[in-house]
C-alpha cells in the first residue's frame, strides 16, 4: 500500500466504559462523510464504518436479545428504543473466529438502506478522519471490504479495512436483492439517447444499477470512484450527458467533491445530479441539495432510483 503524504489524524480516543460519551461522539460526527468509527475484530485487525450510518453505540451485555438457534450470522432480535432490531456478530459475518460471548463489548447500532442493524463488535477504538484520497480500493482482494487505509492508534500506524456496508445489508436481509430484481421487472424502457454517468465503489451496487439501466434501455458509463468520473468528462461533451448519479462514500474522490466540481463548471448547469447513498440524514440531505444535487435516493431502492432518473434526465 502506498505511503500517504497527508496524515490521517485521530479525532478522539473513545472511552468504551462510558456509553453516554460514545453516543455523544457518534452523534457529533454524524454529518461528516469522512468520519469513521474504528473497531477491532477477533483477528486483531482494525475495521471501520462511516459514522453517518451509525445511530449510537450500546453496551452489549445491557441489551436483552431474543436469540436465534440457527447457525447463520444473526444472533437474534432486540427491542431497541421501540424498534425491533436484527443483531449480528461482525466477526461471524466477516469470516473471523467467533470468540466467547463475554469477549464482545459493544453493539454498533446502524441505520441505513431503510434497515436498522445491531453489529456486535469486540471493542471500539477511535473515531478517525479518513479523507477519500487516503483510501485504496480493496474489493478485488475481499468482496466484503470496500477500501483499505491506515489509521493512527496508540501512536502507531495500523492497517484498517473499511467494510462494504451494502454487502452486509444484502447478506443479512437477503430479500433486498430479490425485491430489487422484482422492482426492476416493473420498470419500462424509456427513450433517451444521452448517457448516464454513474459512480459507486460497491461492485454489488454497480451490478444492480447496471441491471436497472439495461432494463430502462439507457446508455451509461460506470466508475469505481468520483475521480474516474471527473477524468472521463474530458472525453464526453455536456450535450451527451443525460444525468450524473453518484455515491457519497468512495475512495480517491467522494461524491460531495464530485458535486462541488460539477457545479463549479457552468457548462454542466443544465444537467441534474442524483445522490445514491446510504449516508443520508436530514442535515446531510439539506447540505447536498444546497450544494447542487437535485435528489437523494437511498440504497437500494431501484424503483425509487428509476423514478428519479425518469424525472431528472435531460
Positions of the model-derived regions?
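His-Asp phosphorelay/catalytic-motif detector in bacterial-type signaling
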Residues: 239-242, 267-272
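An acidic, low-aromatic, low-complexity terminal/linker signal
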Residues: 1-239, 244, 248-257, 278-314
Amino acid at each position: 500500500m502506498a505511503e500517504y503524504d497527508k496524515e490521517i489524524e485521530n479525532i478522539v480516543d473513545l472511552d468504551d466504559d462510558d456509553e453516554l460519551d460514545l453516543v455523544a461522539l457518534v452523534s457529533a460526527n454524524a454529518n461528516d462523510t469522512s468520519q469513521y468509527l474504528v473497531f477491532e475484530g477477533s483477528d486483531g485487525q482494525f475495521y471501520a464504518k462511516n459514522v453517518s450510518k451509525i445511530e449510537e453505540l450500546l453496551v452489549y451485555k445491557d441489551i436483552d436479545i431474543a436469540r436465534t438457534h440457527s447457525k447463520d450470522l444473526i444472533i437474534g432480535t432486540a427491542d431497541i428504543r421501540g424498534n425491533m432490531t436484527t443483531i449480528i456478530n461482525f466477526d461471524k459475518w466477516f469470516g473471523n473466529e467467533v470468540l466467547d460471548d463475554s469477549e464482545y463489548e459493544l453493539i454498533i447500532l446502524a441505520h441505513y438502506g431503510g434497515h436498522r442493524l445491531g453489529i456486535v463488535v469486540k471493542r471500539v477504538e477511535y473515531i478517525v478522519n479518513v479523507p477519500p484520497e487516503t483510501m485504496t480500493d480493496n474489493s478485488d482482494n475481499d468482496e466484503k471490504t470496500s477500501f483499505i487505509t491506515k489509521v493512527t492508534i496508540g501512536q502507531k500506524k495500523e492497517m484498517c479495512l473499511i467494510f462494504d456496508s451494502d454487502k452486509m445489508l444484502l447478506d443479512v436481509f437477503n430479500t433486498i436483492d430479490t425485491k430489487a430484481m422484482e422492482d426492476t421487472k416493473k420498470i419500462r424502457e424509456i427513450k433517451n439517447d444521452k448517457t448516464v454517468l454513474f459512480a459507486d465503489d460497491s461492485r454489488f451496487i454497480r451490478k444492480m444499477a447496471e441491471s436497472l439501466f439495461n432494463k430502462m434501455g439507457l446508455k451509461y458509463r460506470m466508475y469505481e470512484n468520483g475521480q474516474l468520473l471527473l477524468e472521463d468528462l474530458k472525453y464526453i461533451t455536456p450535450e451527451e450527458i443525460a444525468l450524473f448519479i453518484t455515491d457519497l462514500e468512495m475512495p480517491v474522490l467522494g461524491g460531495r467533491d464530485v458535486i462541488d466540481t460539477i457545479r463549479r463548471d457552468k457548462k454542466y448547469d443544465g444537467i441534474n445530479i442524483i445522490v445514491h447513498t446510504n449516508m443520508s440524514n436530514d442535515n446531510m440531505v439539506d447540505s447536498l441539495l444546497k450544494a447542487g444535487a437535485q435528489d437523494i435516493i437511498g440504497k437500494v431502492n431501484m424503483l425509487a432510483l428509476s423514478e428519479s432518473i425518469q424525472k431528472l434526465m435531460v
